[in-house]
Regions:
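Non-cysteine beta-strand/loop elements that form the S-adenosyl-L-methionine
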Residues: 4-8, 66, 100-106, 202-213
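Conserved, mostly hydrophobic/aromatic
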Residues: 7, 33, 41, 58, ...
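Active-site mouth loops of central-metabolism enzymes
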Residues: 11-24, 74-82, 121-128
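Short, acidic/polar
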Residues: 18-32, 82-92, 189-197
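Conserved small/polar residues in nucleotide/adenosyl-binding loops
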Residues: 217-219
């Protein structure tokens, strides 16, 4: 198995909190990513949305697009509606030869609201779980057929947050639904990344390796 090492532009600027690195240019981000030795970078808010503009920019700094975030509303949308919503990003990523789309369900998410407690995040009852898994399986098959697999990102403040959520998703979806294992989000949710890796390694397609300040979690 070969592993390629990339980086996310959130290390330079935060799309959710523009005041963090908002003044940092895309060129500085790409230049420093290359200088640090990375061969790939995920997409971000400052990245061009047209491949005719993005590919030359990446080539300028000897970088490849290694994935990028897509926030879905599959709990509310039909699969066909979600296909239409993701199409522009799908086409861009195919043009850039990215390996996957980092996919997360964000309907009802509290991740962007610092005044909300994590305990108020959205959660699904049994019937909705079944429908959600059926829909994401259908979408996963579609994206796999398009050559751009779905790598699901468990994320704090969203409907798939905990280790239990993540296991339930993987165990009840088609094998085309892959996983982005995020060590920071898993630890924040009091989960065990090592367990996920050992037991679901065949579904892991993308990994986010993150540090986390435990002292802040326990405040």
């Amino acid at each position: 198995m070969s592993v390629k090492l990339g980086v996310a532009p959130i290390a330079w600027s935060n799309d959710d909190m523009p005041e963090l690195g908002g003044e940092t240019t895309l060129e500085q981000c790409l230049k420093e990513a290359n200088e640090a030795g990375y061969i790939g970078i995920e997409s971000g808010g400052k990245f061009p949305k047209k491949s005719s503009e993005l590919i030359p920019k990446l080539n300028q700094f000897n970088l490849k697009l290694c994935s990028g975030w897509y926030g879905a509303n599959l709990r509310k949308n039909s699969v066909e509606e979600e296909k239409k919503s993701i199409q522009e990003q799908l086409n861009l990523f195919k043009d850039c030869d990215a390996p996957c789309i980092v996919f997360a369900e964000v309907s009802g998410s509290i991740q962007g609201d610092p005044n909300r407690k994590l305990s108020t995040r959205p959660q699904m009852e049994r019937d909705e779980w079944q429908k959600f898994c059926e829909k994401i399986s259908e979408l996963g098959k579609y994206l796999e057929d398009e050559g751009m697999p779905l790598a699901y990102h468990h994320h704090m403040g969203t409907v798939i947050e905990t280790q239990k959520d993540t296991e339930r998703l993987i165990e009840n979806t088609h094998e085309s639904v892959k996983l982005t294992l995020d060590t920071g989000h898993m630890l924040f949710a009091k989960g065990d990344s090592k367990y996920i890796l050992q037991n679901y390694h065949e579904r892991i397609l993308h990994v986010h390796c993150k540090d986390i300040r435990l002292s802040l979690i326990h405040i």
